[in-house]
Regions:
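PLP-dependent aminotransferase class I/II
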Residues: 1-153
Length: 153
């Protein structure tokens, strides 16, 4: 699946597929993730969180408060949330990268040793459908839908 995602996404500006950092590593790619450049414009990003909050508070990555205060200090960028919402509308389930543990309410008072990497990845990352039942045709459809959600002007 990763090889096909890599091939189909290689020329999509603003999207980077996570891969092995060097030949010393050999990922099993049980989860394929992409990073969206913060400058990448995605259809609907101006209202991405508004639409999600209206649907279900807590449904958006990082939303943990009532709708009057729907944003937190650690949430995916609007273009990531807009891509997730856009893919969902096309029948594709995706999700933000995991929210850093030290930013989750249950761990807010626990000691944490952080350097900012987990927060920065959470803001720009999106998990794509992966696994043995994701066919080549599925991957092609997913990438096509990603492209359709990008504003190219």
């Amino acid at each position: 699946t990763c090889d096909l995602y890599r091939e189909l996404l290689k020329d999509v500006r603003g999207i980077t597929l996570h891969e092995n950092p060097s030949g010393r590593f050999d990922s099993n790619y049980w989860l394929n993730t992409i990073v969206l450049d913060p400058l990448l414009r995605v259809k609907g990003q101006e209202n991405a969180y508004q639409a999600t909050v209206q649907g279900a508070v807590g449904g958006a990555g990082g939303v943990t408060h009532a709708a009057v205060n729907a944003h937190t200090d650690c949430e995916p960028n609007a273009n990531v949330e807009a891509m997730r919402v856009g893919l969902d509308a096309m029948g594709i389930e995706s999700r933000p990268l995991w929210k850093p543990m030290h930013k989750q309410p249950v761990y807010k008072d626990c000691p944490a040793y952080v350097n900012g990497v987990s927060e920065s990845l959470f803001k720009v990352g999106l998990c794509l459908p992966s696994g043995p039942y994701v066919t080549d045709e599925d991957v092609a459809y997913i990438v096509d839908c990603i492209k359709k959600n990008i504003c190219y002007n």
